[in-house]
From Swiss-Prot:
Ranges for region Disordered: 16-41
Membrane topology, record value: Multi-pass membrane protein
List of glycosylated residues: 100
Similarity-based family: Belongs to the TMEM200 family.
Topological domains, Cytoplasmic: 1-61, 148-491
Stretches with biased composition (Polar residues): 20-34
Ranges facing Extracellular side: 83-126
Residue positions, PTM Phosphoserine: 350
Protein name listed in UniProt: Transmembrane protein 200A
């Protein structure tokens, strides 16, 4: 049984091998037919189109090309006449004819026959024919070369135009992308409005600085609708915790935002003004990257000692009432602004003065005694040069805590060499007024001396007040207001 099983398995294996071999033969047999049926592979056509210039035959080089062809044809004809084969039997037959018959044939033949009879088989034609043909071929080759050179020049010009057009297209696309990126970064897409809030002080400072020193006064317009005032008031309240009250409210007045004359003092103190810029800052210049110009370094007088211990809410409400009236200049054409006030003293550290009387005198004056110090107002009243001189040389006399009558100027203060002046810095484009009346002499207010007895604590406070440094952190500012009673600010 075992032997028969082995034989059966062997036979099955042999059958499998035979079937596999037969299949291989069947597959190999039609292979030559398939090889013959394979199509011949063709070269793929190039998709790149070669742009070339035209061969312009209507040109001087084309004229010389045609001339060379004609000269070469003439040379070929001359060579054919010189090397034309001769036939001797025709010549022998013609010699038998009489002289009279030959004369009649010559007269009837004409000029062409005479020419062929004279120059046929001549040595001149054998020599001049190839020479003229060579001259014609030379002219043809030179003209053809010039034509192809002109075509190559045209192709180069075409390629250069293509390159320039692609470069210009890429450059315009990059400019559009940069404008879009700058618009997304700065928020100034085209002529859209710039919203004023507590965190946009740097952009307002840059825009107003450009407008004041470059003559862009007409590019600004004020929008004083009720809805926008309410919206900006809400935004100012939401961002009021970022800045101290005096600094946040005085920054609006420093930026030169002044209301229309029909507004009352309550509208001025609202602080909700919206400034719109049109085509001042381009897409490539970001207002956030402009440097902040340091206009003034001054120490602001603190309120009275009795008011130091008041709550922060009362201090904020009081500072908001004084925010828009902080920077004022007396009107030059009115007589009311030059009336001396008995309770107002100039900024002089050598003379002692009452803190409470200063605060009450600043609150006593109304808004009609002066005008906000803005680029447009200064330009209307005094001109561009005098407004710059006003902002630069008398920056020490500006008090952000006082009323309109506190802006006093003295000759010693104007000539002090240590104070910053714009005409000593990079204020190019403005000429200093010479041999003319100084407009700052109109702002002189007579000094009124008030005698009062002070305690030792008040004297120490006044002495320490004159030597305080400017603080640039809001937390220290608030703590110093509550503890020492000093208020510092920065622009």
């Amino acid at each position: 049984m075992i032997a028969t099983g082995g034989v059966i398995t062997g036979l099955a294996a042999l059958k499998r091998q035979d079937s596999a071999r037969s299949q291989q033969h069947v597959n190999l047999s039609p292979s030559p037919a398939t090889q013959e049926k394979k199509p011949i592979r063709r070269r793929p056509r190039a998709d790149v189109v070669v742009v070339r210039g035209k061969i312009r035959l209507y040109s001087p080089s084309g004229f010389f090309l045609i001339l060379g062809v004609l000269i070469s044809i003439i040379g070929i004809a001359m060579a054919v006449l010189g090397y034309w084969p001769q036939k001797e039997h025709f010549i022998d037959a013609e010699t038998t004819l009489s002289t009279n018959e030959t004369q009649v044939i010559r007269n009837e033949g004409g000029v062409v026959v005479r020419f062929f009879e004279q120059h046929l088989h001549s040595d001149k034609m054998k020599m001049l024919g190839p020479f003229t043909m060579g001259i014609g071929i030379f002219i043809f080759i030179c003209a053809n070369a010039i034509l192809h050179e002109n075509r190559d020049k045209e192709t180069k010009i075409i390629h250069m135009r293509d390159i320039y057009s692609t470069v210009i297209d890429i450059h315009t696309l990059r400019i559009k992308e940069q404008r879009q990126m700058n618009g997304m970064y700065t928020g100034l897409m085209g002529e859209t409005e710039v919203k004023q809030n507590g965190s946009s002080c740097a952009s307002r400072l840059a825009a107003n600085t450009i407008a004041s020193f470059s003559g862009f006064r007409s590019s600004f317009r004020m929008d004083s609708s009720v809805e926008e005032d309410e919206l900006m008031l809400n935004e100012g309240k939401s961002s009021g915790h970022l800045m101290p009250p005096l600094l946040s409210d005085s920054s609006v007045s420093v930026f030169g935002l002044y209301p229309p004359p029909s507004k009352t003092t309550d509208d001025k103190t609202s602080g909700s003004k919206k400034c719109e810029t049109k085509s001042i800052v381009s897409s490539s210049i970001s207002a956030f990257t402009l440097p902040v110009i340091k206009l003034n370094n001054c120490v602001i007088d603190e309120p009275s000692i009795d008011n130091i211990t008041e709550d922060a809410d009362n201090l904020k409400s009081r500072s908001r009432n004084l925010s828009m009236d902080s920077l004022v200049v007396p009107l030059p054409n009115t007589s009311e602004s030059f009336q001396p006030v008995s309770t107002v003293l100039p900024r002089n550290n050598s003379i002692g003065e009452s803190l409470s009387s200063q605060y009450k005198s600043s609150m006593a004056l109304g808004p009609g005694a002066g005008q906000l110090l803005s680029p447009g107002a200064a330009r209307r009243q005094f001109g561009s040069n005098t407004s710059l001189h006003l902002l630069s040389s008398h920056s020490k006399s500006l008090d952000l805590d006082r009323g309109p009558s506190t802006l006093t100027v003295q000759a010693e203060q104007r000539k002090h060499p240590s104070w910053p002046r714009l005409d000593r810095n990079n204020s190019k484009g403005y000429m200093k007024l010479e041999n003319k009346e100084d407009p700052m002499d109109r702002l002189l207010v007579p000094q009124v001396a008030i005698k009062k007895d002070f305690t030792n604590k008040e004297k120490l406070l006044m002495i320490s007040r004159s030597h305080n440094n400017l603080s640039f952190e809001h937390d220290e500012f608030l703590s110093n207001n509550l503890k020492r009673g000093t208020s510092e600010t920065r622009f």
